[in-house]
UniProtKB/Swiss-Prot annotation:
Residues at which [4Fe-4S] cluster binds: C349, C409, C412
Name of the featured protein: 3-isopropylmalate dehydratase large subunit
Catalytic reaction equation(s): (2R,3S)-3-isopropylmalate = (2S)-2-isopropylmalate
One Gene Ontology term from the biological process aspect of the record: L-leucine biosynthetic process
EC nos: 4.2.1.33
Length: 469
């Protein structure tokens, strides 16, 4: 198949175009469809109403993540609605011969953690899932985006979607990250400067020497939060780091097929003369450990900065900043360091992988969680949990006073028992700090890297992780 020149986004889009619709939209073939228990039940119900089968069940993979409790594996689940949702997913997968990675299978976990670790996510794919953070999979050089329930139905029935093609913005970061600065800080820095709506209508191509130095798990963290900057998808061009990560994984090509796949994947990378709709550049040296202070992921500061005054902000941002200060009970001009913390959460599809847990464990080893602070670690998958336990990371965390949990989405969102209470404030390695996001209508969330969360747990307040390294 001949392939036009241009960006990876252009190439992958062209390869998966079925037709241009009268509306001007593209009918795009979806190579991999990931489903979970929250956004799939209604989609399956709509298929049943129409008497439609799942067209390509082998291109759909299911797991359970959002609603599972992390403190027990017992069935039935204590929450009757959660148990009903899980049973519905199990029944739908059986009825349509869809592979299901269930609790205790060794493959269950957060959908955006398990697909990459199983080798399901590969360069050049189009990937859809009824979940905002599907952009995670772009770390492999895939075009991946979240969809709604009606679109989940469309993919199940036709394996295609009707979509408007996005513009492409190159987000270039150059240089080496300093000690104590992580991928989470990179994406929070980018969103702070480009805005939570800055990427609307765009795909973000993350490029530059910094990304060449990042591991696949670090690239996943960045792409995961592209959506928080308004970009429906974000991606990194595949390279040797990508191929080394995928080689030998359960669903990766084997033998001769592997060699052919790698040759194909190499050709997908954006060409040197590719044209972009916009290009922005950042220097790694300007990025410090970063903490959100408000109610959007774009409201953040470096850990050694003070919170912005309203007058220092663009006029368009002042109203939501004032709203954030009132909700968070913080003051313009105060340092973010020293903000007291009640709960510390390490996990999520953003930062629940083995490298995240290793970074956090380095901080807590030989130290103790501050009395009065509730701290817990939720591995992103059963595979991550097993690997962490094989390395003794669970022992390190438990000795420090952290709770060691089972895999799931946990306190990232309010769909399971892990929730903030009242006005509690959390240091969280998750991706959203919206009002009420972590379960309490008045709960408050500060987003930061897993290592920064670990440092906050020890200090009982926001603190600079660099002092712990």
């Amino acid at each position: 198949m001949s392939m036009s020149r241009g960006t990876l986004f252009d190439k992958v889009w062209e390869q998966h175009t079925v037709a241009t619709l009268p509306s001007g939209q593209t009918q795009l073939f979806i190579g991999l469809h990931l489903i979970h228990e929250v956004t799939s039940p209604q989609a399956f119900a709509m298929l049943r109403e129409r008497g439609l089968p799942v067209l390509y069940p082998q291109r759909t993979i299911a797991t359970v993540d959002h609603i599972v409790p992390t403190d027990t594996l017992a069935r039935p689940l204590q929450d009757a609605l959660a148990e009903e949702m899980l049973q519905a997913l199990e029944a739908n997968c059986r009825a349509h011969n869809i592979p299901f990675f269930g609790i205790g299978s060794g493959r269950q976990g957060i959908v955006h953690v398990i697909a990459p670790e199983q080798g399901l996510t590969q360069p050049g794919m189009t990937i859809a899932c009824g979940d905002s953070h599907t952009s995670t999979h772009g770390a492999f050089g895939a075009i991946a985006f979240g969809i709604g329930t009606s679109q989940v139905r469309d993919v199940l029935a036709t394996q295609t979607l009707a979509l408007n093609k996005l513009k492409v913005r190159k987000v270039e970061v150059n240089g080496s990250l300093a000690a104590g600065v992580y991928a989470k800080d990179v994406i929070l820095h980018v969103i702070r400067h480009l805005g939570v709506k800055g990427g609307v209508g765009y795909a973000y191509e993350f490029a530059g020497t910094t990304f060449g130095q990042l591991s696949m798990e670090e690239r996943m963290t960045v792409c995961n939060m592209a959506i928080e900057g308004g970009a429906r998808c974000g991606y990194v061009n595949p390279d040797e780091t990508t191929f080394a990560y995928l080689k030998g994984r359960p669903f990766a090509p084997q033998g001769k097929a592997w060699d052919e796949a790698v040759a194909w994947w190499r050709s997908l990378a954006s060409d040197a003369d590719a044209e972009y709709d916009d290009v922005v550049t950042f220097a790694a040296a300007d990025i410090a450990p970063t903490v959100t202070w408000g109610i959007t992921p774009g409201q953040s500061v470096a850990v050694d900065e003070t919170l912005p005054t309203l007058e220092s902000l663009p006029v368009a941002e002042r109203a939501i900043a004032a709203e954030a200060y009132a909700y968070m009970d913080l003051q313009p001009g105060q340092p973010i360091q020293g903000t007291k913390i009640d709960v510390c959460f390490i996990g999520s599809c953003t930062n629940g992988r083995i490298s995240d847990l290793r970074q956090a464990a380095k901080v807590v080893e030989g130290r103790k969680v501050k009395p009065g602070v509730k701290a817990f670690v939720v591995p992103g998958s059963e595979r991550v949990k097993a690997q962490a336990e094989a390395e003794g990371l669970d022992v390190v965390f438990k000795a420090a006073g952290f709770e060691w949990r089972n895999p799931g989405c946990s306190m990232c969102l309010a769909m399971n028992p892990d929730k903030l209470q009242g006005r509690q404030i959390s240091a969280s390695s998750s991706n959203r700090n919206f009002k009420g996001r972590q379960g309490s209508p008045s709960g408050r969330t500060l987003l930061m890297s897993p290592a920064m969360v670990a440092a906050a747990a020890i200090a009982g307040e926001v603190t600079d992780v660099r002092a712990f390294l």
